């Protein structure tokens, strides 16, 4: 997968994505990351990329010229189809489903904003406007790095165990079940017996039920449009009954 990032702070993005699993994926050429400082395309004598908004108002806006010309360079190097993602608090909220959709693409471009916002004409370059959530941060770099991490994990070969991406929270539509490792007991806290009895049918059933229970307790909104199996419907009734009796 080819990923371009247009940013005023390229070192921040490069350093943030050069670590751990994503860094190894870049080293193995599974992810081709290129970060461009769009300040390099500024044509005014002060090398600035922002200006005051027409009509007045607080803050400064990113001017279209540097970003348009940075995109011209991206398109010249790779003229094929690409998804161009604008990091914007007003965009659609990023989630696992969006990550899975973007992971199917061959080429992604992230435009990281700064200052008060963008000249509206910049939006004509983009295919998607995406936000991390209902809050505002100083720039788009952190959001881009989070999204790139989530997307890259879904690229074949990036994770050592492909099943990890399948069983992660949200990949199944539910939160992940509790997990345990050695020792079997620590400070009076014991690993559930079912996980140590070797019966994989019972283990899988326990995991499925605990995943449903954790989702009901922490993110019940995820169940609103979730198509429950007959077993899950039965477990959910039991979970609700247990909760009511507490």
From Swiss-Prot:
Protein's name according to its UniProt entry: tRNA (guanine-N(1)-)-methyltransferase
Stored CDD domains: TrmD-like (cd18080)
Protein family per UniProt: Belongs to the RNA methyltransferase TrmD family.
Lineage: Bacteria, Bacillati, Bacillota, Bacilli, Lactobacillales
Record's keyword annotation contains DNA-binding: no
Catalyzed reactions: guanosine(37) in tRNA + S-adenosyl-L-methionine = N(1)-methylguanosine(37) in tRNA + S-adenosyl-L-homocysteine + H(+)
Example GO biological process: tRNA N1-guanine methylation
Molecular function terms from GO: tRNA (guanine(37)-N1)-methyltransferase activity
